[in-house]
Amino acid sequence: MQPDEKEIVKSELLVVTGLSGAGKSVVIQSLEDIGYFCVDNLPPILLPKFVELMGQGNPSLQKVAIAIDLRGKELFKSLIHEMDLIKSNSDVIVDMMFLEASNERLISRYKETRRAHPLNGNGQRSLIESINEERELLTEIKSLANYTIDTTQMKPKELRKRIGDYFNKSNVQTFNINVTSFGFKHGIQMDADLVFDVRFLPNPHYVDELRPLTGEDEAVYKYVMKWKETNIFYEKLIDLLKFMVPGYKKEGKSQLVIAIGCTGGQHRSVALAKRIGAELNESFDYNVYVHHRDAHVESGVKHKDEKN
């Protein structure tokens, strides 16, 4: 680089969409708090013009987040076409985040806020019908996202922390790996890219002194790891993940969600997720996060997110 040349830093655009009630407002507020210029409910047809403005070097538009939802139902249909257009702009880095949650959680949130669903403005259909229609309409949009977050088990504080972990950084492009334990009886991890079932492993639930503990406790961890089948499975899975992870990054994904499931999400999946997260953190120069979704549901112990 010549002395009088300045390094060109590309502007960044994050399009935030997803199911109504899944947390778009929390995400936009969180991004605004860390310095993003945020726009709520921009019609998709205006995206190319907005990206053109970003590419002109306006410092206030260096990092932009735009929330788009189905309130303008007919206008929303053009989003896929507009996303193809703006991703061809070499001056701006374009990402998409998709937020989702289970029907039960969305219904609960709507009952708490007493707001009408955007697809039920005339009040002539049930809430669940509106949610199901929206989920179907967004199926193709979801496939475009390189960030997908399932907020079913998240409180607003936890979602804000996740957004901060992802985006409160320098302009260096990063790759995030989320290793999540969960219990099948509480529902599958909806935003998972990879799901592994460890219910075939010996279960600490049937050991009286281990039953109230979680896989984060040393006694449970040692119990799960002492079995031959556990270690064979672990070694094979780590080999597979070390092969797959670079491929996901090469294909342009910004995050990879690996979900480890057992019956209740308290013992086996927690122990395996903890060990897998530690190994991936040692093996890759990426951000690795470990989250135990259901451990607190079964044990009564409040869970915490870990960053390796």
Swiss-Prot record:
The keyword Kinase does not apply. Keywords: ATP-binding, GTP-binding, Nucleotide-binding. InterPro entries: P-loop_NTPase, RapZ-like, RapZ-like_N, RapZ_C. GTP binds at residues 69-72. The keyword Coiled coil does not apply. GO terms for molecular function: ATP binding; GTP binding. ATP binds at residues 18-25. HAMAP family: RapZ_like. NCBIfam families: PRK05416.1. Belongs to the RapZ-like family. PANTHER family: RNASE ADAPTER PROTEIN RAPZ. Displays ATPase and GTPase activities. This is Nucleotide-binding protein SSP1952. It comes from Staphylococcus saprophyticus subsp. saprophyticus (strain ATCC 15305 / DSM 20229 / NCIMB 8711 / NCTC 7292 / S-41).
